[in-house]
Protein backbone atom coordinates (compact mmCIF):
# COMPACT_ATOMS: atom_id res chain seq x y z
CA UNK A 1 0.00 0.00 0.00
CA UNK A 2 2.69 2.44 0.98
CA UNK A 3 4.30 2.07 -2.41
CA UNK A 4 1.26 3.37 -4.27
CA UNK A 5 0.15 6.02 -1.79
CA UNK A 6 3.43 7.71 -1.07
CA UNK A 7 3.35 11.48 -0.98
CA UNK A 8 5.90 14.16 -1.60
CA UNK A 9 6.16 17.88 -0.91
CA UNK A 10 4.44 20.04 -3.49
CA UNK A 11 7.64 22.10 -3.76
CA UNK A 12 9.55 19.00 -4.89
CA UNK A 13 6.87 17.69 -7.24
CA UNK A 14 7.56 20.03 -10.15
CA UNK A 15 3.85 20.37 -10.90
CA UNK A 16 4.13 24.10 -11.52
CA UNK A 17 6.90 23.94 -14.12
CA UNK A 18 5.54 25.34 -17.38
CA UNK A 19 2.07 25.61 -15.86
CA UNK A 20 -0.61 28.21 -16.47
CA UNK A 21 -2.25 29.52 -13.30
CA UNK A 22 -5.93 29.80 -14.23
CA UNK A 23 -7.38 31.17 -11.00
CA UNK A 24 -5.90 33.57 -8.46
CA UNK A 25 -6.70 36.75 -6.58
CA UNK A 26 -3.32 38.44 -6.92
CA UNK A 27 -4.57 41.68 -8.49
CA UNK A 28 -4.14 44.03 -5.52
CA UNK A 29 -6.82 45.97 -3.72
CA UNK A 30 -9.89 44.83 -5.64
CA UNK A 31 -11.41 41.94 -3.65
CA UNK A 32 -10.74 39.68 -0.65
CA UNK A 33 -7.38 38.66 -2.05
CA UNK A 34 -4.11 40.60 -2.15
CA UNK A 35 -4.34 44.19 -0.95
CA UNK A 36 -0.89 45.69 -1.48
CA UNK A 37 1.05 45.97 -4.74
CA UNK A 38 4.24 44.89 -2.96
CA UNK A 39 2.67 41.60 -1.89
CA UNK A 40 1.27 40.97 -5.36
CA UNK A 41 4.71 41.45 -6.88
CA UNK A 42 6.16 39.05 -4.30
CA UNK A 43 3.57 36.44 -5.29
CA UNK A 44 4.41 36.84 -8.97
CA UNK A 45 8.10 36.43 -8.13
CA UNK A 46 7.30 33.21 -6.28
CA UNK A 47 5.28 31.95 -9.24
CA UNK A 48 8.37 32.54 -11.38
CA UNK A 49 10.60 30.67 -8.94
CA UNK A 50 8.44 27.53 -9.04
CA UNK A 51 8.23 27.55 -12.83
CA UNK A 52 4.80 28.98 -13.63
CA UNK A 53 4.68 30.37 -17.18
CA UNK A 54 1.39 32.29 -17.40
CA UNK A 55 -0.95 33.75 -14.79
CA UNK A 56 -4.61 34.63 -15.16
CA UNK A 57 -5.62 37.20 -12.56
CA UNK A 58 -9.27 36.48 -11.74
CA UNK A 59 -10.73 38.95 -9.21
CA UNK A 60 -14.21 38.36 -7.84
CA UNK A 61 -17.23 40.00 -9.40
CA UNK A 62 -20.37 39.53 -7.30
CA UNK A 63 -23.10 41.54 -5.63
CA UNK A 64 -20.93 41.93 -2.51
CA UNK A 65 -17.86 42.88 -4.58
CA UNK A 66 -19.31 44.69 -7.65
CA UNK A 67 -16.03 45.33 -9.45
CA UNK A 68 -16.35 47.35 -12.64
CA UNK A 69 -14.54 46.17 -15.76
CA UNK A 70 -12.88 49.54 -16.38
CA UNK A 71 -11.54 49.72 -12.82
CA UNK A 72 -10.13 46.19 -13.00
CA UNK A 73 -8.43 46.94 -16.30
CA UNK A 74 -6.88 50.08 -14.80
CA UNK A 75 -5.56 48.17 -11.81
CA UNK A 76 -4.24 45.44 -14.10
CA UNK A 77 -2.37 48.08 -16.12
CA UNK A 78 -0.81 49.41 -12.91
CA UNK A 79 0.32 45.91 -11.95
CA UNK A 80 1.81 45.14 -15.35
CA UNK A 81 3.71 48.44 -15.30
CA UNK A 82 5.14 47.63 -11.87
CA UNK A 83 5.98 44.01 -12.69
CA UNK A 84 9.36 43.43 -14.39
CA UNK A 85 9.48 39.64 -14.48
CA UNK A 86 9.03 37.02 -17.17
CA UNK A 87 5.49 35.78 -16.45
CA UNK A 88 2.81 36.32 -19.07
CA UNK A 89 -0.05 38.06 -17.26
CA UNK A 90 -3.71 38.10 -18.26
CA UNK A 91 -6.84 39.65 -16.75
CA UNK A 92 -10.15 37.82 -16.38
CA UNK A 93 -12.63 37.49 -13.51
CA UNK A 94 -14.33 34.95 -11.26
CA UNK A 95 -18.05 35.52 -11.58
CA UNK A 96 -20.58 34.60 -8.92
CA UNK A 97 -23.81 33.36 -10.48
CA UNK A 98 -26.07 35.99 -8.92
CA UNK A 99 -28.28 38.90 -9.96
CA UNK A 100 -25.34 41.15 -10.81
CA UNK A 101 -23.96 38.47 -13.10
CA UNK A 102 -27.27 38.27 -14.95
CA UNK A 103 -27.05 42.02 -15.58
CA UNK A 104 -23.43 41.89 -16.74
CA UNK A 105 -24.12 38.90 -18.98
CA UNK A 106 -27.03 40.65 -20.64
CA UNK A 107 -24.88 43.75 -21.19
CA UNK A 108 -21.91 41.73 -22.45
CA UNK A 109 -19.79 43.35 -19.72
CA UNK A 110 -17.53 40.39 -18.94
CA UNK A 111 -13.86 39.48 -18.51
CA UNK A 112 -13.44 35.94 -19.88
CA UNK A 113 -10.45 33.65 -19.89
CA UNK A 114 -8.92 32.66 -23.23
CA UNK A 115 -11.20 31.44 -26.02
CA UNK A 116 -14.29 33.07 -24.41
CA UNK A 117 -14.17 30.71 -21.43
CA UNK A 118 -15.92 32.30 -18.47
CA UNK A 119 -14.88 31.41 -14.91
CA UNK A 120 -17.98 31.10 -12.71
CA UNK A 121 -18.70 30.08 -9.13
CA UNK A 122 -21.61 29.55 -6.77
CA UNK A 123 -22.16 29.45 -3.02
CA UNK A 124 -20.36 26.52 -1.41
CA UNK A 125 -23.54 25.39 0.31
CA UNK A 126 -26.48 25.86 -2.06
CA UNK A 127 -27.00 26.24 -5.81
CA UNK A 128 -28.12 29.52 -7.34
CA UNK A 129 -31.66 29.85 -8.61
CA UNK A 130 -32.15 28.25 -12.03
CA UNK A 131 -28.44 27.40 -12.36
CA UNK A 132 -28.76 25.24 -15.46
CA UNK A 133 -30.70 27.92 -17.30
CA UNK A 134 -28.00 30.48 -16.44
CA UNK A 135 -25.28 28.15 -17.72
CA UNK A 136 -27.21 27.59 -20.94
CA UNK A 137 -27.70 31.35 -21.33
CA UNK A 138 -23.94 31.83 -20.98
CA UNK A 139 -23.44 29.37 -23.82
CA UNK A 140 -26.12 31.03 -25.95
CA UNK A 141 -24.14 34.28 -25.66
CA UNK A 142 -21.10 32.56 -27.16
CA UNK A 143 -19.19 31.89 -23.93
CA UNK A 144 -18.04 28.59 -22.43
CA UNK A 145 -18.63 28.20 -18.67
CA UNK A 146 -15.73 27.04 -16.51
CA UNK A 147 -16.91 26.08 -13.02
CA UNK A 148 -14.36 27.09 -10.40
CA UNK A 149 -13.42 24.51 -7.73
CA UNK A 150 -16.41 22.13 -8.07
CA UNK A 151 -14.89 19.92 -5.37
CA UNK A 152 -15.74 22.60 -2.81
CA UNK A 153 -19.49 22.68 -3.46
CA UNK A 154 -21.02 20.64 -0.67
CA UNK A 155 -24.42 20.48 -2.35
CA UNK A 156 -23.06 18.66 -5.41
CA UNK A 157 -22.75 14.90 -5.77
CA UNK A 158 -21.48 12.47 -8.40
CA UNK A 159 -24.73 12.61 -10.36
CA UNK A 160 -24.67 16.41 -10.43
CA UNK A 161 -21.05 16.49 -11.61
CA UNK A 162 -21.96 14.11 -14.42
CA UNK A 163 -24.96 16.26 -15.37
CA UNK A 164 -22.77 19.35 -15.62
CA UNK A 165 -20.17 17.56 -17.72
CA UNK A 166 -23.02 16.39 -19.94
CA UNK A 167 -23.81 20.08 -20.46
CA UNK A 168 -20.19 20.64 -21.60
CA UNK A 169 -19.30 22.63 -18.49
CA UNK A 170 -15.55 22.74 -17.87
CA UNK A 171 -14.20 22.15 -14.35
CA UNK A 172 -11.30 24.04 -12.76
CA UNK A 173 -9.41 22.27 -9.98
CA UNK A 174 -8.08 24.12 -6.96
CA UNK A 175 -4.71 22.40 -6.48
CA UNK A 176 -4.74 23.07 -2.69
CA UNK A 177 -7.80 20.80 -2.49
CA UNK A 178 -5.49 17.85 -3.21
CA UNK A 179 -3.46 18.64 -0.08
CA UNK A 180 -6.47 18.89 2.23
CA UNK A 181 -6.33 22.67 2.47
CA UNK A 182 -10.14 22.92 2.48
CA UNK A 183 -10.77 19.83 4.58
CA UNK A 184 -10.98 16.08 3.98
CA UNK A 185 -14.28 16.09 2.07
CA UNK A 186 -13.06 18.53 -0.58
CA UNK A 187 -9.85 16.49 -0.86
CA UNK A 188 -11.74 13.25 -1.51
CA UNK A 189 -14.02 14.94 -4.04
CA UNK A 190 -11.03 16.47 -5.85
CA UNK A 191 -9.26 13.12 -6.05
CA UNK A 192 -12.37 11.40 -7.41
CA UNK A 193 -12.98 14.11 -10.02
CA UNK A 194 -9.32 14.01 -11.01
CA UNK A 195 -9.31 10.23 -11.38
CA UNK A 196 -12.50 10.47 -13.47
CA UNK A 197 -10.78 12.92 -15.82
CA UNK A 198 -13.37 15.63 -15.22
CA UNK A 199 -11.03 18.59 -14.74
CA UNK A 200 -10.05 20.79 -17.67
CA UNK A 201 -7.68 23.24 -15.97
CA UNK A 202 -6.29 24.07 -12.55
CA UNK A 203 -5.17 26.92 -10.35
CA UNK A 204 -4.32 27.83 -6.79
CA UNK A 205 -7.16 30.30 -6.06
CA UNK A 206 -4.42 32.22 -4.26
CA UNK A 207 -5.62 34.97 -1.88
CA UNK A 208 -2.53 35.37 0.34
CA UNK A 209 1.21 34.90 -0.14
CA UNK A 210 1.27 32.72 2.97
CA UNK A 211 -1.20 30.33 1.31
CA UNK A 212 1.25 29.66 -1.52
CA UNK A 213 4.04 29.13 1.00
CA UNK A 214 1.87 26.63 2.89
CA UNK A 215 0.89 24.88 -0.34
CA UNK A 216 4.52 24.35 -1.33
CA UNK A 217 5.23 22.77 2.08
CA UNK A 218 2.19 20.48 1.92
CA UNK A 219 2.17 16.81 0.93
CA UNK A 220 0.57 15.58 -2.28
CA UNK A 221 0.15 12.03 -3.61
CA UNK A 222 2.74 11.11 -6.23
CA UNK A 223 0.25 8.94 -8.09
CA UNK A 224 -2.03 11.85 -9.02
CA UNK A 225 0.58 14.37 -10.15
CA UNK A 226 0.40 13.38 -13.82
CA UNK A 227 -3.40 13.75 -13.81
CA UNK A 228 -3.46 17.44 -12.88
CA UNK A 229 -4.44 19.43 -16.00
Which residues make up each language-model segment?
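An N-terminally biased module of ancient metal coordination in phosphate/nucleic-acid-related enzymes
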Residues: 1-86
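Extended substrate/RNA-proximal surfaces in nucleic-acid metabolism proteins
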Residues: 2, 68-168
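Active-site environment of divalent metal-dependent phosphoester hydrolases
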Residues: 62-65, 96-98, 151-156, 178-181, ...
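Non-catalytic positions within long, well-ordered alpha-helices that form the structural scaffold/packing
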Residues: 48, 139, 194-195
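A general structural detector for well-ordered alpha-helical segments in enzyme core domains, enriched
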Residues: 39-43, 75-79, 134, 160, ...
Amino acid sequence: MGLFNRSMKVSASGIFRGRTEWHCHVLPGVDDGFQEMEDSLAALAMYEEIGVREVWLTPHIMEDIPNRTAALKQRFTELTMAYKGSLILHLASENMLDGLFDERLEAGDLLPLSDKRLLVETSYFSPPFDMDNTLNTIKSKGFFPVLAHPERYMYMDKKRYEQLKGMDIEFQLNIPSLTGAYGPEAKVRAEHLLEAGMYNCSGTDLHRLSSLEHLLKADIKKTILHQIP
